Amino acid sequence: VTPAPRTEQETTIATLTLRTGFEVELLAPAGSDRQVLADDLAARCGGSVRRSSHTDSEPSAVPGVGLFRHLSPAFDVVGPDGAPVARLVDDITIEADVAAAPRTPPGHRGWYRVLCDDARLLRLVERHVDPAAALPDVLAPIAALFGTVVELVGGAARVNDATGATVAVAMPLPGGRERPCEVITPPLTRDHGAALDALLAPARALGFTVPVEAAVHLHVDGAPFRRPAAFANLVRLFGRWREPLWAALGTNPACRRLAPLPADLVALVERDEQTGWADLGAAARGTGVTKYADVNLTQLVAARPVRDTVEVRILPGSDEAAAIVARAALVERLLLRCLDDRPVPAPGADAVRDPAGALAALAGVPA
């Protein structure tokens, strides 16, 4: 997608310097779906759309099964040279607007989810199935792996192992789940606002809107924060400055899967003893760090990170590139402040009166 020209507002107010990936949560209008946007974006850049799967999890109603993990339809937009443009996926936290609208019948466009109660098995399933296959056929490679057959039960397909234990089930996509559309960008190194606008302006033109629970997530490279001083400052920023950050950024109170950092983690970085990164990272893993917090540090402290990023999750939902970049610019400056070995101080009284001003002062932004 060709980026739109940079607006005067973007040029003079908000410019990002860090390599940054964005996740922007949108909602397709009733009767439409995320593939419509994928096809439109591909047509605009002379690229193509590749069907893929998105992994997520949700609480299970089955006794003894805590979570059901699933694969849902995702769409990767690539340019004519094969370079990634955007990835469009479901987001199960988007519920209110879907529930309020008349439901479409299950299995929109023949779409389905593949469910499994074991993360390792689901990774095996994802590796072997064709995400574009029809529901009755998608699990055939898994049945072959286990030496069994696909059982068709009503509108679902199931594979059991030789003992009768269920490996995976494919079921029609619940009505309405075709509408949530999280737009995931590749890492952007320049012209962040223009690149975002090239994705969001077409979405607005197609009637996509910002859902009730929406958020915008930022991913920046994690490596610079894998030092004790920088990591401690990152924890201090999001641990001590939570209320000013929410106020200054306009965090959406309806957004789900946000939480403060564990108190044990905040205490850990204030200990007097000197320790190297390996020991600090291992200790941090034991404090209950979770992805679903205001800032996702799980990949930063993981022994084997899957995605080597720090994920900031508290920006409010928006479909306007300039607004997203303006908020991201403050976050970027605060993250850069964390790389300074001087400890990030606790907020003072001014942070209550003027949270945006206090954060700007902390970040070193000129008044």
Residue ranges, per PLM feature:
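Active-site histidine-anchored catalytic micro-motif
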Residues: 213
